[in-house]
Amino acid sequence: MSDRPLPSSFDPYNSYLLRILLCSVLPVQFLAVHELITRPIPAGCLATSYALLRAYKSMKAGDSAQLNRMFRFRIYAQAFTLLAGVGGGFYYQAERAQRKELERAVADKKAQAKRDAWLRELEIRDQEDREWRERHEAVGKAAKEAGNKPKEANLDAPKVPTKESEEAKPTGGILDAVKSLGKEK
């Protein structure tokens, strides 16, 4: 068996354990029970409506004693509703403030996580941009070095002009190139 003692009706955590049990077993019903416990105003409204319905039925039946009892019950239910609203407002004021604080902290944490993710994405994009620029500069430097290198083959050999190389060498730019095209025909 477990090391914990059996629960007692005098145990201050009894209702807490009951709520935990209800929450784990029946979450939808737990929410209804929790709302009824923390906000008893709907229960007062239902009791008032029930009293009015019973008063109507008593009036139709002609039972004036039951009618008077139901009207008194309606007044008690309305008083309960008012007291529940005022008392619940005072009683749960600290809890509501604590819940708002918790919700604000969760929202701040969520916003901070979103901001951190955005900053990480910006850093990744910046790193990719830097890497691309470095590669682009490396390719540009390699192209410049390849363009500036003289051809190493036959540098020591004497240059002898040939007829083909003299004819193919344009001297006047585009106009000479067009004229040379006309000569080939």
Swiss-Prot record:
Bilayer-crossing regions: 16-33, 75-92
Bias kind Basic and acidic residues: ranges: 128-154
Region (Disordered): 128-185
Listed InterPro entries: Hypoxia_induced_domain, RCF1
Pfam families: HIG_1_N
Family the UniProt entry places it in: Belongs to the RCF1 family.
Main subcellular location: mitochondrion
Annotated protein name in UniProt: Respiratory supercomplex factor 1, mitochondrial
Function: Cytochrome c oxidase subunit which plays a role in assembly of respiratory supercomplexes.
Complex and partners: Associates with the respiratory chain complex III/complex IV supercomplex.
Segments forming domain HIG1: 12-103
